[in-house]
């Protein structure tokens, strides 16, 4: 699949917490850094997300939130 987003980070799923509707996915990227995303449980199932899976996070610059 071809996408236009330039902010793509490859990594490994090191955490997965499933809720009733959504899931929290933790991806370890280069340098041991981690990013966390909340996605729908349907997406987790459709994409086959599981701990240890190699995935690519696609990040739109307009959808980034910074927490302190």
Curated annotation (Swiss-Prot):
Keyword hit for Zinc-finger: no
Domain (Mop) ranges: 2-68
Keyword Transport set for record: no
InterPro entries in the record: Mo/tungstate-bd_C_term_dom, Mop_domain, Transp-assoc_OB_typ1
Keywords assigned: Molybdenum
GO terms, biological process: molybdate ion transport
Function: Binds one mole of molybdenum per mole of protein and contains a pterin.
Matching NCBIfam families: Mop
Protein name (record): Molybdenum-pterin-binding protein 1
Annotated source species: Clostridium pasteurianum
């Amino acid at each position: 699949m071809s996408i236009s987003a330039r902010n793509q980070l490859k990594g490994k799923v090191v955490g997965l917490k499933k809720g009733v509707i959504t899931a929290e996915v933790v991806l370890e990227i280069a340098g041991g850094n981690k990013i966390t995303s909340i996605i729908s449980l349907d997406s987790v199932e459709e994409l086959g997300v599981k701990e240890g899976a190699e995935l690519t996070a696609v990040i739109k610059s307009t959808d980034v939130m910074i927490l302190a």
